[in-house]
Amino acid sequence: MEFSVKSGSPEKQRSACVVVGVFEPRRLSPVAEQLDKISDGYISSLLRRGDLEGKPGQMLLLHQVPGVLSERVLLVGCGKERELDERQYKQIINKTITTLNETGSMEAVCFLTELHVKGRDTYWKVRQAVETTKAGLYNFDQFKTNKAEPRRPLRKLVFNVPTRRELTIGEKAIAHGLAVAKGVRVCRDVANMPPNVCNPAYLASQARRLADSFDNITTKVIGEQEMAELGMNSYLAVARGSENEAMMAIIEYKGNADAKPIVLVGKGLTFDSGGISIKPAEGMDEMKYDMGGAASVLGTMHALAQLQLPINVIGVLAGCENMPGGNAYRPGDILTSMSGQTIEVLNTDAEGRLVLCDALTYVDRYDPETVIDVATLTGACIIALGHHTTGLLANHNPLAHELLNASEQAGDRAWRLPLFDEYQEQLESPFADMANIGGRPAGTITAAAFLSRFTKKYNWAHLDIAGTAWKSGKDKGSTGRPVPLLTQFLLNRAGVDIEEKE
């Protein structure tokens, strides 16, 4: 798919299709008015006849409109003009792309990026249009023998911007949008892989593949023998029940020789049966998505490398599998973590934190500027925030605010939960330094409280993506989140700010 920006009048476009908006009730957008004028009222007469009301997502495809050079005109319902917000804008773009892809229009000029979206500028509208387009056209069909493909799919999309001085902004928005979209695709492809393919070794191979693709990325992989030498006994305990060896991939991106690195740590449970504390059979197939954190770190590192940002970032993919084998760890076991702290296992299905605690201890050797871990950690986060919002907890207020700001900019929302000392009391154990669960109340917070005991030497944030990493039902599959949030955070850290864009 090829993207570009231009600035011009709709009536002068020679294209397979021109896309313009119509507001409710039957009100032409300024661009649609220009086409109506050149066609001697042809479009407005159709609206008066009741062919299109302008409700959000309504579509009307016109052929051979008088006076218009393009073969087709696609009228897109945008709802009430004053109520057009970012969520509705993305829904409209998605519906538009689906329609274009099915009409045989292999190229189109889209004027929807000229619509006024509350609180958003041209950069945001173009970038979101690119990201939404790529996400909408995504299809994971690698294991299907009969692949359904459009006969004449959309190949080229041009976004129109109001003035020529905004062309540079639009080009930057496309570059950023394509990088984020590629990162999202990498994340979704890896996460959607079946667990008989995507095991810890496969996850590590994808990290090596990334290093082969970019000169400023290197990857090393730590196996179980080296983990044992490092004292990563908590991580290794989770892996004991599986025939698949645990592997931790460390991806290093160097864009600034002098800066301390930002470290991203992704939970990579390529399949989580729950172990001895086994999960119910219903829905267990979706536990292949328990490596969504690692997949999102991999995708973010790809986006970062494509953007060539002048910062240093280390991505850690903590690959592992939690299975109920004869050598599996048990409820009641006491583990000595890499940090030296001891952990009483009360539930083997609270395994992600046992993997992450050793990974978070390991990354201290890089003297990090900031550490962010990403994990499908707790079902409690779904109860608290549902499937729309990622949970955020942090030991450093400025970092939390940075991430919240990036989440709003990227349209990949997060919400902060508290991390008060009182929650630590729920982790007390009579036999070890801590238990690996704190009971049902505040499950997301106590999981983060557990991790906070291993992150005292640096600024740290935790993203719980249990509710946002994948969808169930008819739209089942990885969402690619929070790649947009993390990439935006890195763009901001690299100094690519709003002033530069404007």
From Swiss-Prot:
Entries under SUPFAM superfamilies matching the protein: Macro domain-like, Zn-dependent exopeptidases
Signal peptide as annotated in the record: none
A Pfam family reported for this protein in Swiss-Prot or TrEMBL: Peptidase_M17
Residues bound to Mn(2+) 1: 272, 349, 351
Domain of life per record: Bacteria
Function: Presumably involved in the processing and regular turnover of intracellular proteins. Catalyzes the removal of unsubstituted N-terminal amino acids from various peptides.
The protein, known as: Probable cytosol aminopeptidase
Native species: Aeromonas salmonicida (strain A449)
Record lineage: Bacteria, Pseudomonadati, Pseudomonadota, Gammaproteobacteria, Aeromonadales
Gene: pepA
